[in-house]
Amino acid sequence: MKARKASAALADLFLVLFLSMSQAADADIIEIPSGAALFGGTGGPLIVAGDPNGIPPDSPDNRVDPNTPTSPFSGVVSINIRFVEGGVAESFLCSGTLVASRYVVTAAHCLDVDGTGKLVDITQTGNDVRVAFNAGALGEPGRVNITASAVSMNPNFEGFGVCAFPESFLCINDDIAVITLGQDAPVEAKTYRVFSGDVTTGQLITMVGYGVSGNGVTGYDFVNYDADFHIKRSGQNVLDVFDRDDEKNFALASPQENWFADFDGLGKDLFCTTLGVCTQVLANDKEAMIGPGDSGGAAFLFNGSEYFLMGDLTFERFGDPRGSFGSGMGGNLFSAYIDYLEGATGGVIETVSAIGTVPEPGTCTLMLIGLGLAGAATRRRGKLRKVKL
């Protein structure tokens, strides 16, 4: 009963929103227009910087990756999903990560055409999925767009927020998909080994994606720092709490499937205030938040020499203003989905269960698991809406 009550209390804590961004549907090249609106009520992708007047000061420009082959994030890609559904042409931007020369991992909701887990059919006229590599400057071999030859979705994914748990929770489990490239990725783009072990409260992660940015004081800035297929940003955070397998009623003995973190600054610490989970607040120029367009992006662990793909970025919890300090975020842990990933990639991905020393910036005060942390009533799902450009 205690776990069930905790889930109910958290129902109003988390509103998840799509991190994918709408884009002009008839574009022949992968470019996103400015002023894009995003999904409300379910989760959104991006890396938001700290306080512009903090110590040290920060800005979205400080978080931009150089897009070079030597960047540790050269294998983090942007994705353009285009399809016609109900006679309406749609186009979206998401992020993803290269795990083998022909395979990119992203979020399942990026490839879902109707919110029920219906996979985009790329054999139909007007439908395609294109992956943009940014491992070099324009005209260099590391910058290339590759069209997908196949797409796959975790079979347990039935739509964003749809939960296998027998009660009316809104959960974000199983949100993982694989894109098969029509040709090999450029050699300039890094491939990443997938972490298959457990994670704990207090561990440091690095998040990378192509979403909207902004700062922790004023939140998302869709005018000056909109999502862009060729601008990726990175930032760090600390793992706070986790959730278990919804197909197994979030039983404590079931695998961890979701991770949660919060965007701390100016005295605002979401999980410390609401749950008593008080992990370390990172430096102003390190702490980050995700946002619209980061969906499917990378959550890495770093052991001092190599980045390992721990999971994806899939949802946010609104701050006030949205994307500011006090917001929450999270994604899926790939350790729970190794069987799916190996099957979808023909077994060519490389997994590792132990990676040596991982920086742990804060002492964990509490680890909450099996609580249905993103749980919300059915009425929350009814509020999900897609805002077009």
Language-model segments: which ranges?
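Bacterial N-terminal signal peptides that target proteins for export
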Residues: 2-11
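Bacterial N-terminal signal peptides
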Residues: 11-20
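Chymotrypsin/trypsin-fold serine protease catalytic domain
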Residues: 173-176, 182-287
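A conserved glycine-rich beta-strand in the N-terminal activation segment of trypsin-fold
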Residues: 76-78, 84-101
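Sec/Tat signal peptide C-region and signal peptidase I cleavage site
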Residues: 21-27
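A short, hydrophobic C-terminal helix/tail in secreted or cell-surface proteins
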Residues: 360-378
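C-terminal subregion of chymotrypsin/trypsin-like serine protease catalytic domains
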Residues: 28-61, 67-72, 93, 97-112, ...
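C-terminal membrane-anchoring or membrane-association module
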Residues: 375-389
